[in-house]
Amino acid sequence: MGKIIGIDLGTTNSCVAVMDGDKARVIENAEGARTTPSIIAYTDNETLVGQPAKRQAITNPKNTLFAIKRLIGRRFESEEVQRDIKIMPFEITRADNGDAWVNVKGDKLAPPQISAEVLKKMKKTAEDFLGEAVTEAVITVPAYFNDAQRQATIDAGRIAGLDVKRIINEPTAAALAFGLGSTKENQVIAVYDLGGGTFDISIIEIDNFDGEQTFEVLATGGNTHLGGEDFDNRVIDYIIDEFKKEQGVDLRNDPMALQRVKEAAEKAKIELSSAQSTEVNLPYITADATGPKHLAINVTRAKLEALVEDLVASSIESLKTVLKDAGKSVNEINDIILVGGQTRMPLVQQKVAEFFGKEARKDVNPDEAVAIGAAVQGGVLKGDVKDVLLLDVTPLSLGIETMGGVMTVLIEKNTTIPTKKSQVFSTAEDNQSAVTIHVLQGERKQASANKSLGQFNLEGINPAPRGMPQIEVTFDIDANGVINVSAKDKNTGKEQQIRIQASSGLSDEEIEQMVRDAEANAEADKKFEELVQARNQADGIAHATRKQIEEAGDALNADDKAKIEAAIADLEKAAKGDDKAEIDAKTEALIKASEPLMQAAQAKAQAGEQPQQSAKDDGVVDAEFEEVKDNK
């Protein structure tokens, strides 16, 4: 059995790590970077992932997909998706099942299918490092992800060819990375995780007893639609509005210009973490009847902070709620860990420090901690990491809809998982022969205001007055936070159960089809790579042969030269096509046709040695002749 890798599947960047001895190691990708942009681009010939996809985004905005994690497990009609539709350069569309999917070149793609491309890149990165196949992974998700979003992440893993052994919450993973091997007896830490698209806050207690470490999540909260992308969007809106005031042109109508502004806004935001001001300079951003337009706007740190202060404030409000849920005061928090690239912003660090009355730790890498923690969890599951117990919680309350449209909670939020809970319900009408179990997730009393995870029917209930039948409903949450629900008629023993597959989720058939598509694409990608290699080889051989013809000169007879040049022309024509077999055949034909060239080159080399010797002798004679002449 191979290693279980740890993957931080991020909104903006992703990272992969693996246990190397007793320590987790972050693995560099093919480009030499420790993190990979979570960007996927579809071109005419191939699918690009990471930095190559990011580099061509400006020229291919409609088919370059980013921040897909914000769509995963979400309904098209949801407020968050409708907000994203207005600002994304690519087309978000409604799937047949009501999910938010993406339209690329006329094909509808599911977010798990797109995210699987990033996971495949992480898988390949690990395989290249380990020198062996990788089939198992621990993947992280925001702590505040609901069941549909967790299921969709597992689906993405399956499509990428990975058996997802565990889904682990990002703040919990960061705590594992921070606390593993610590000798402190008892400490309570706050993990503030503000990433590219999601925000989480978790209060975690780390205990050491007899050499065994226990990581217990006391409470968690957050917002799955708050992150660096939202900060970027505030800067983008500011730049576009300022340009419109100056030039009267709205850049939102130009996808290519919008992509340039997005890149510049992200760069400006990052620069303002260390500088007090920066200039956004985009020449030839657009043009009208009067000619080309240039964008040059100065952005100060103070302006950036004014644009995003409400976003930072909303994260601090979540801190207050989670501390209360954990039953802890600010003074009881020993350490604060900042995770996610957006926590590099000075305003974020300042507000967190003000809230806790102490500075956050600086010795945790905000980009890598989550992947390292996932790798540690992989080591725990594999048995390579001993004496570590992880106790996570469910982030949202779970229950069913009961009479009057009320949500009756069976499992409260922040309950340690895995867990199982049963409760007995009854019928609302006389002689009712069936009941519908509507499963909900959320904190609102009104059933319709919560997230619907799915519903099923329990039929065959014996006729009886209302309130008499006893229907036992059981919720079972596994260590991934994935839910199974069953309903049993205690009188007849009849039982109906479902593993919650939200109405918005992918069916097993769809996932299997996507797995097959991914495998087919992998084969197509391999063939394309082989074709490119054959073309490159053909180009190299043609160039080298031409050079040899020049060097051979008259040593190569005219007939042979004509045959070789014809073979070069045939090869160059084949290299422009897509038939690798033909390119290989024409390459071999050129090599064979070039045999006289090799013989001519050898003959010329041998002939070159003889004249060189003669020239040397002539030099000696001339010298002697001149010597005699002088003596006369």
Curated annotation (Swiss-Prot):
GO molecular function: ATP binding; ATP-dependent protein folding chaperone; unfolded protein binding
Signal peptide: none
Sites bearing Phosphothreonine, chain numbering: 198
Source domain of life: Bacteria
SUPFAM superfamilies membership: Actin-like ATPase domain (SSF53067), Heat shock protein 70kD (HSP70), C-terminal subdomain (SSF100934), Heat shock protein 70kD (HSP70), peptide-binding domain (SSF100920)
Family: Belongs to the heat shock protein 70 family.
Protein purpose: Acts as a chaperone.
Protein name according to UniProt: Chaperone protein DnaK
Organism of provenance: Actinobacillus pleuropneumoniae serotype 5b (strain L20)
Gene for this chain: dnaK
